[in-house]
Amino acid sequence: MESLLQKVYDQENLTKAEMNILATEIFEGRLSKTKMAAFLMALKVKGETAEEMAGIAEAMQEVAIQVAFPAGTAMDNCGTGGDKSNSFNISTTSAFVLAAAGIPVAKHGNRSISSRSGSADVCQELGIDINMRPEDMTYLLEKVGIAFLFAPHVHPNMKYVMDVRKELGTPTIFNLIGPLTNPVHLETQLMGIYRRDLLKQTAEVLGQLGRKRAVVLNGAGFMDEASLAGENHYALYESGEVQLFTLSPEEVGLANYPLEAIRGGDAKENAAILRSVLEGEPGAHLDTVLLNAGFGLFASGKVATVKEGVNLARDLVRSGLAKQKLADLITYQKEVLTK
């Protein structure tokens, strides 16, 4: 163990297997807080590699509370957070549109990181229980096609790193790997990331973690979501290869809006925005969700282009199917809670 730590201190890269060993020590509470802090900062200064990100993500998944679902059928669309955009809950809203397309969505989420309301906060405001048993999450995935997985609930071993992360007060590798550690074995994934320089690398990591197809994107204004404010950069992983692309809102028939147009509020305000989008209320909020859902549909392989995805997303909202997914989730959740 000491030799692995020393490698990082000496600015040497770890292999995936070496990082897995070291991360297992962390998640089983065997690494002191002092050594953990030194390791995280040395890793940050050195720069995290794809092998290291995959190694720590796999170790985190191994100690997670497993949520059973047929392998190779579900997707996730959560992002890293950390973009300081204070936007409304874009990926959470988009998840209902993806589910309405018949894609099982295992939505990994947490409380607020860069905004006033995280995925878990707005879910609670909507009446969604974020602390359900694994078997209940499986039931909702099967019956409704969507379930929300509260990260601290499914990753209890993160308790060993929380104090150190808080004390350091700076982003570490844990800010990057959250979306990589969904306890459901995913086939496809849309992942927003706040660092554009890591698009290709993160897409490679998703491939190492078994995704068949994935899109990693960074929006205009360095958002961890697709943005209407300008050019969006994204990486597509498929068949073992990564390709880099850019896409502007105009290319998919959407208008430009400044970042200020999608500012969010607290959980109550963001829940109201989510409902208004699912009702089809026109404007920047709806168009932003259409763009992100379009990317999600493209990442899933449901459509051949993002533009086709945007058009399908619009149809799913107009038809009321996306709104119905929220209603169904609440209905079936009550059934679970009364068992």
Swiss-Prot record:
Keyword Repeat tagged: no
Reactions catalysed according to its record: N-(5-phospho-beta-D-ribosyl)anthranilate + diphosphate = 5-phospho-alpha-D-ribose 1-diphosphate + anthranilate
Keyword Ubl conjugation: no
Gene3D superfamilies noted in UniProt: Nucleoside phosphorylase/phosphoribosyltransferase catalytic domain, Transferase, Pyrimidine Nucleoside Phosphorylase, Chain C
GO biological process: L-tryptophan biosynthetic process
UniProt-listed Enzyme Commission number(s): 2.4.2.18
Binding site for anthranilate 1: 79, 110
Recorded GO MF terms: anthranilate phosphoribosyltransferase activity; magnesium ion binding
Positions contributing to anthranilate 2 binding: 165
Cofactor(s), names only, from the UniProt record: Mg(2+)
Listed pathway(s): Amino-acid biosynthesis; L-tryptophan biosynthesis; L-tryptophan from chorismate: step 2/5
GO cellular component: cytosol
Binding-site list for 5-phospho-alpha-D-ribose 1-diphosphate: 79, 82-83, 87, 89-92, 107-115, 119
Top-level class of the enzyme under EC nomenclature: transferase
Residues reported in the UniProt entry to bind Mg(2+) 2: 224-225
Free-text comment on the cofactor: Binds 2 magnesium ions per monomer.
Assembly with partners or alone: Homodimer.
Annotated function: Catalyzes the transfer of the phosphoribosyl group of 5-phosphorylribose-1-pyrophosphate (PRPP) to anthranilate to yield N-(5'-phosphoribosyl)-anthranilate (PRA).
Protein name: Anthranilate phosphoribosyltransferase
Organism: Listeria welshimeri serovar 6b (strain ATCC 35897 / DSM 20650 / CCUG 15529 / CIP 8149 / NCTC 11857 / SLCC 5334 / V8)
